[in-house]
Amino acid sequence: MSGPALTHIDSAGEASMVDVGDKTETVRVAVAEGFVRMKPETLALIREGNAKKGDVIATARLAGIMAAKQTSSLIPLCHPLMLTKVSVEIAPDDALPGLRVEAMAKLTGRTGVEMEALTAVSVACLTIYDMAKAADRDMEIGGVRLVSKSGGRSGDYRREGDMR
């Protein structure tokens, strides 16, 4: 069977950390996204800054940034990385209704930052849920996915259909 191989499985079929020591350092950037769907009145509460636990958007943004920096502690085979930039943008979306989350992670290094961007989005979404659950336990977290990545041996990737 040919095709892409799983990089974290060794010849004996065991999980192992990839050796990136021989890779060339390049600028790596990854963007991920997700959303938290909620009742319109919950979104209004967050917009007005009246959530019981405080500023939901600011707290979720910080949680996402902190999570990206802790990715290797959370996901067993991820390398600890010296991230040079992490940003988390959270925007209300009345059509959802809810909040859309986008994270970007960047570094100059030997391995990609896709997991860091995905972790940032995931934890930002979880933080939104935690901070607003008193008002709306029916919230739904979804759409967590890689949007794009650049740098490295495998080249650039952009999710089809996205115009970013």
From Swiss-Prot:
The active site is at residue 130. It catalyses: (8S)-3',8-cyclo-7,8-dihydroguanosine 5'-triphosphate = cyclic pyranopterin phosphate + diphosphate. It comes from the Bacteria. It holds the Pfam family MoaC. InterPro entries: MoaC, MoaC_bact/euk, MoaC_sf, MoCo_biosynth_MoaA/MoaC, Mopterin_CF_biosynth-C_dom. GO terms for biological process: Mo-molybdopterin cofactor biosynthetic process. Keywords: Lyase, Molybdenum cofactor biosynthesis. Substrate binds at residues 77-79, 115-116. One of its GO terms (molecular function) is cyclic pyranopterin monophosphate synthase activity. Pathway: Cofactor biosynthesis; molybdopterin biosynthesis. Its EC number is 4.6.1.17. It is an enzyme of class 4 (lyase). Catalyzes the conversion of (8S)-3',8-cyclo-7,8-dihydroguanosine 5'-triphosphate to cyclic pyranopterin monophosphate (cPMP). NCBIfam families: moaC (TIGR00581), PRK09364.1 (NF006870). HAMAP family: MoaC_B. Belongs to the MoaC family. Homohexamer; trimer of dimers. This is Cyclic pyranopterin monophosphate synthase.
